[in-house]
C-alpha cells in the first residue's frame, strides 16, 4: 500500500522517566526516534517493560502515573503535543488521536447502553449532531462486521461477547475520524478464533478510512498481519526498525531474532519423549459432569458446563486441554482440584477414588494435586514476601519451619530459576514472569504428583511465556511431575503435551496424541482451532478469514435432542438429515485419535486437505 511521504507523526529524542516526586528517577524510554507516514500502520513490539505502551501513550501527550516526558518532541501533524496545555490536550485526545485499549470491558460503563457510549466522544468534541453520530455509529458497526448493526447499540456491554465488545470499542475510538489511532494489545485476551474476526475488522476499517495507526503488541505473528513497518523495542531502546517483511525474514539484531524464535515453541524434547513407553496411570477422570442451578430428573445440573468428560494421565506425562473461552477447560481443572464439585462421574488418583468436593479430601490428597492459576496477580498476596509465600505450604504440608524452611525456599527459587535475592521482595514488586515462577514454586513446595496449569502463559509476553514453557519441561524432567496443561494456544499445547483433549461447549470432541493432532484429519472444531493460530507471514489473516467464514451448508430444523453435536451451528462439514437429527458417537481414526463426529476419516482428511473446495455433499460414515 502506498503512503504519503510526509509524516503525520515525528518522534525525536523522546525520553520518559519514572520515579517518586523528589526522589531518584529511572529512565524508561531512552531518546527514541521514529516517524509514521499518513495512512501507515506502525507496530511497536517488545517484551513487557520494553517501553512500547509508554511510547504509544506519549503520542497523546500522556504519561502514566509516576512517569513524565522528560525530553524530546512528539509532533502530530506538525504540532508538538509535549508542549500543549491541558485544555489543548483534551481537545486533541479522542478527536485527532484515539486509543483502543486491551480490556474493552474496562472501557465501557455497564449501566449505559453501548450506543450512548460510542457516540459520546463525537458529542463532546462537537464534530456532529446526535442524529449524525448515531448514523455514523451504525456505519461503523457494519464496517466492523458486528451482528445486527442497526440494533446492537441498544444493548448493554454485558449483553455482547468479548470479541464484539472489542470491536465496539474500536467504533468508539473511530467515531470522530481521528488522524491517528493507537491499538494497545487489543486482541491479547481473545481466543484465536475470535481474534481473526477482530483483526480483520480493525484492518479493514483502518485501510478504508486511510488513517494512520500504531499497533502495540508482543506477538510478532499478529503484527505481521497488521503493520507496514515494525519498531522493535527492549529496555526503552529501539533495537531494530524496518519494513514488516524485512523484520520477519531478515532480522539483523539478536533481540529481534530471539522474538522470532519464541513464536514457535520448540518440541525436540517432546519428540524424544513421545517415543518412550506409556507411563503408569496417575489420574483417571471418568464421565465428569459439572454445572450450576437446580438438578434435573436425571440428577444433572440445570446448566451443564462439563458433559461426561473423560481424561487419563500417566506419571511424568502432560495432557493438554484446549478450547475456546467457555469450552469448560478451567471448570475441568477445578473439578479435578475439587474446587468445583462434580455432580457426576468419578475421579481416581492412583486407582483410589477422590472425593468430588475439596472439603472432603484429605491433606495428603490436596498435597498431591496442586493448581497454578492464570493470573498470578490475583493468586499471590502482593504484600507478602516471596519467602513467606513459599514458607506457608512448606509448614502446612510438611511441617518444615525455621532455618530448614529458609533452605527449602532457596532450593525452590533455584528450581524455578529465580535469584535468591527475590526471597526478601514482596510479590507485588515482581514482574509478570517472576510472579508466575513464584506461583509455580508455591505449587512445587507441596511436592505434588500432579500440577494443573490453567492458562499459565496467556498473560505473559511471547519471550517470557516461552521461558515458562521451557521451565515446565525442565521441572518435569527433574521431578517426574505430571501436568494438565490448559490453554487456547495450539502451538503451546503441541509443544508441551503428550496427549491432547479438545473441549467444545463442555464436551470432549477429540482426544489423541500430540503427533495425531499435528496433521489432519481432525475433528472439524480442532481443524478450526489449528487454522486460526496466527502464522508468521503477511497475508495469513486474509487466508484465515476466508477459511473461517466459508458459507455453511443449509440444514433443516434440528431434532429436540440435547445429545446432538454441540458444534453443529458452526460446522462447515455438517450434513442435513444426519448431524441435525442424531447424536454422533466417538470414532477412532487410524492415527489413534478419537473424534466425536458423523463424518468418516476419509471425508475429514479430504476436506481439511482442500479447504477451499469443501465436501458437503459427501455422505457420513455408517455407524
Predicted regions: what they are:
Residues 7, 25, 150, 244-284, ...:
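Charged, flexible cofactor/metal-binding loops and thiol motifs
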Residues 47, 190, 194-267, 460-542:
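P-loop NTP-binding/switch modules centered on Walker-like glycine-rich loops
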Residues 60, 64, 337:
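Helix-to-loop junction immediately C-terminal to a conserved catalytic motif
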Residues 68, 81-98, 116, 124, ...:
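ABC ATPase NBD coupling module
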Residues 132-151, 404-421, 530-531:
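Conserved ABC ATPase "signature" region
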Residues 155-160, 164, 426-430, 434:
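Conserved ABC ATPase signature
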Residues 168, 173-174, 444:
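ABC ATPase C-loop
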Residues 177, 447:
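Conserved catalytic motifs of ABC-family nucleotide-binding domains
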Amino acid at each position: 500500500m502506498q503512503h504519503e511521504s510526509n509524516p503525520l507523526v515525528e518522534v525525536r529524542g523522546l525520553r520518559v522517566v519514572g520515579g517518586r516526586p523528589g526522589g531518584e528517577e529511572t529512565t524508561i524510554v531512552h531518546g527514541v526516534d521514529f516517524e509514521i507516514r499518513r495512512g501507515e500502520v506502525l507496530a511497536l513490539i517488545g517484551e513487557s517493560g520494553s517501553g512500547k505502551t509508554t511510547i504509544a501513550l506519549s503520542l497523546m501527550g500522556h504519561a502514566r502515573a509516576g512517569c513524565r516526558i522528560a525530553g524530546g518532541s512528539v509532533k502530530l501533524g506538525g504540532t508538538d503535543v509535549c508542549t500543549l496545555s491541558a485544555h489543548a490536550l483534551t481537545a486533541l485526545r479522542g478527536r485527532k488521536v484515539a486509543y483502543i485499549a486491551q480490556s474493552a470491558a474496562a472501557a465501557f460503563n455497564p449501566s449505559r447502553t453501548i450506543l450512548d457510549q460510542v457516540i459520546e466522544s463525537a458529542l463532546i468534541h462537537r464534530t456532529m449532531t446526535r442524529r449524525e453520530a448515531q448514523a455514523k455509529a451504525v456505519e461503523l458497526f457494519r464496517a466492523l462486521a458486528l451482528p445486527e448493526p442497526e440494533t446492537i447499540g441498544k444493548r448493554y456491554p454485558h449483553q455482547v461477547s468479548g470479541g464484539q465488545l472489542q470491536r465496539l470499542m474500536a467504533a468508539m475510538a473511530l467515531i470522530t475520524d481521528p488522524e491517528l489511532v493507537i491499538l494497545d494489545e487489543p486482541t491479547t485476551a481473545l481466543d484465536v478464533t475470535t481474534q481473526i474476526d477482530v483483526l480483520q475488522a480493525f484492518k479493514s476499517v483502518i485501510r478504508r478510512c486511510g488513517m494512520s495507526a500504531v499497533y502495540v503488541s508482543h506477538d510478532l505473528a499478529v503484527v505481521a498481519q497488521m503493520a507496514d513497518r515494525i519498531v522493535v523495542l527492549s529496555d526503552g531502546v529501539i533495537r531494530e526498525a524496518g519494513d514488516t517483511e524485512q523484520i520477519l525474514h531478515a532480522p539483523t539484531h539478536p533481540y529481534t531474532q530471539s522474538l522470532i524464535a519464541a513464536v514457535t515453541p520448540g518440541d525436540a524434547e517432546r519428540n524424544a519423549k513421545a517415543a518412550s513407553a506409556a507411563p503408569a496411570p496417575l489420574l483417571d477422570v471418568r464421565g465428569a459432569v459439572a454445572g450450576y442451578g437446580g438438578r434435573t430428573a436425571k440428577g444433572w445440573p440445570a446448566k451443564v458446563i462439563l458433559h461426561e468428560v473423560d481424561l487419563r494421565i500417566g506419571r511424568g506425562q502432560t495432557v493438554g486441554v484446549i478450547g475456546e473461552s467457555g469450552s469448560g477447560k478451567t471448570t475441568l481443572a477445578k473439578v479435578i482440584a475439587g474446587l468445583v464439585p462434580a455432580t457426576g462421574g468419578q475421579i481416581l488418583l492412583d486407582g483410589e477414588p477422590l472425593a468430588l468436593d475439596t472439603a472432603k479430601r484429605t491433606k495428603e490428597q490436596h498435597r498431591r494435586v496442586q493448581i497454578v492459576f492464570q493470573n498470578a496477580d490475583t493468586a499471590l498476596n502482593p504484600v507478602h514476601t516471596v519467602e513467606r509465600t513459599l514458607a506457608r505450604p512448606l509448614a502446612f504440608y510438611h511441617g518444615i519451619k525455621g532455618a530448614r524452611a529458609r533452605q527449602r525456599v532457596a532450593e525452590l527459587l533455584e528450581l524455578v530459576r529465580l535469584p535468591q535475592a527475590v526471597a526478601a521482595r514482596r510479590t507485588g514488586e515482581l514482574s509478570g514472569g517472576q510472579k508466575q515462577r513464584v506461583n509455580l514454586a508455591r505449587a512445587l513446595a507441596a511436592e505434588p504428583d500432579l500440577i494443573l496449569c490453567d492458562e499459565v502463559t496467556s498473560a505473559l509476553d511471547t519471550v517470557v511465556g516461552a521461558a515458562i514453557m521451557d521451565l515446565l519441561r525442565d521441572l518435569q524432567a527433574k521431578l517426574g511431575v505430571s501436568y494438565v496443561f490448559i490453554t487456547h494456544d495450539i502451538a503451546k499445547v503441541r509443544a508441551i503435551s503428550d496427549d491432547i483433549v479438545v473441549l467444545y461447549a463442555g464436551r470432549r470432541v477429540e482426544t489423541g496424541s500430540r503427533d495425531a493432532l499435528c496433521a489432519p484429519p481432525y475433528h472439524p472444531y480442532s481443524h478450526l482451532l489449528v487454522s486460526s493460530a496466527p502464522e508468521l507471514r503477511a497475508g495469513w489473516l486474509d487466508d484465515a478469514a476466508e477459511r473461517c467464514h466459508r458459507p455453511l451448508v443449509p440444514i433443516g430444523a434440528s431434532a429436540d435432542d440435547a445429545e446432538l453435536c454441540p458444534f453443529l451451528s458452526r460446522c462447515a462439514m455438517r450434513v442435513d438429515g444426519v448431524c441435525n437429527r442424531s447424536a454422533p458417537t466417538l470414532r477412532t481414526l487410524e492415527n489413534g485419535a478419537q473424534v466425536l463426529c458423523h463424518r468418516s476419516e476419509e471425508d475429514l482428511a479430504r476436506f481439511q486437505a482442500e479447504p477451499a473446495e469443501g465436501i458437503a455433499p459427501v455422505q457420513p460414515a455408517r455407524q
